[in-house]
């Protein structure tokens, strides 16, 4: 299982940090206290499943779709009501501004994560 640390902005597996990134916008970047604020806070704590990957015309190539592991099998997080979470790349024009809650990681890391076959993610504070 992969682990995303909300406050540190790190992706780990087996206790080893694999990459650094960010989740959230403005004051919400890697700020767990704002996880419930749509469009600003980081991806909410909990378990997620990576269900597919695709090339997005909006957020770029090798985007990974995340579904919350909760009472409803969809990409909406029941506890916060937020949804549409992805793992995708950063903005080329304005680095550090691509997330409204999605996890932003380099493409090589996204490819490695997907190809690992381990599609479970736990988001911790």
Per-region residue spans from a language model:
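Gly/Pro-biased beta-strand-loop elements
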Residues: 1-83
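Exported/periplasmic cell-wall-interacting domains
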Residues: 47, 54-125
